[in-house]
Amino acid sequence: MRLSHPYPFLLSTDFVKVPNAIVTIGTFDGVHQGHRAILEDMVNSAKEIEGETVVITFYPHPRQVLNIDSSNLRFITNQEEKIKHLEEIGIDNLIVVNFTKEFSRVSSESFIRDYVIENINPAKIVIGYDHHFGKNRMGDFSLLQDLASQYKFKVQRIEAHDVENIAVSSTKIRLSLQRGDVEHANMLDRKSVV
């Protein structure tokens, strides 16, 4: 897996555009079953069109930078574990964006247009059902659909991954672990530890 650590807005010089890039964006804390549904779909889509997968993630976590519940925020996986899980799934390229307050002010449309399209030129962007991005989390699937027709890429939304009628999410796994309910966290995902 190729790993890039770009300054916000610019890809590092070692990242080379790939043909038929299948892209996703997110923090991917825990790389849980819901994330895996997105990532595995990407891997399959890339194989079908002889492309490569590109995951764009952020470090530090946006909540740490924006001070949203950051004092009690505990992560399911650290950065190294996340990278290992992404590599095991078969992701070809990982871009870790340095998340700063300045970067948090980039509008969702500008992020997709000036960063993702300009630097990666995706064939398709795949996101989860509840994914939001850009300033104040204003970007969503609807915006991606609008931009897709304008910039000629495909967009796909992966629906919630449910376990016993509960949509799997990093937040739900974290809350289970904070309560000491490792069994519930494991039900939502693979083995967790406290």
What annotation goes with each model-predicted range?
Residues 2-194:
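Nucleotidyltransferase catalytic core that binds NTPs
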